[in-house]
């Protein structure tokens, strides 16, 4: 498990350090720093982790998702031979204010339903909260640098996968975004 933070002052850093210390048998590391890869801060932050990863599988997950213990199993469960990427729209939970409630209403009604319907029709598209890749697919399309050529990495991910004749699939259960 590779955790990435752009700055040591990131609010998640103390939690990640505690998790690593509490689970010494799990191979994990925290990488801090920013590489100017593109105009996308998320990709700039993830680049060091992408370079450090040695697995054939890569999962890019936003830090504001609540992940169940079977997160990776759920992503793998929908993988097929013609899959290039597995993603999942988030479910908005626990809004703290009016604008949080608006975000939850959007995520949990229009956005999630359209995305799930598209997936059922074989036209699934990525949501940047969860991007589960086979490394060879991402690298064949130009790697993280290719994702940075578009404003949104999820749109670029969908295009990269489809350009290779592969499909984006969605996890069968969504993940909470408080």
What are these regions (language model features)?
Residues 1-4, 29-30:
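Hydrophobic targeting segments
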Residues 4-6, 54, 61-63:
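Active-site acidic Asp-centered loop
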Residues 171-178:
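Active-site donor/metal-binding and catalytic loop motifs
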Residues 10-11, 61-78:
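Acidic donor-binding/catalytic loop of UDP-sugar-dependent glycosyltransferases
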Residues 18-51, 55, 70-141, 145:
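Long helical/loop segments within the catalytic core of UDP-sugar-dependent glycosyltransferases
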Residues 151-156:
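Acidic donor-binding loop at a coil-to-helix junction in glycosyltransferase catalytic cores
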Residues 5-18, 35-37, 65:
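A conserved acidic beta->alpha catalytic loop
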Residues 160-162:
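Hydrophobic residues within well-ordered alpha-helices
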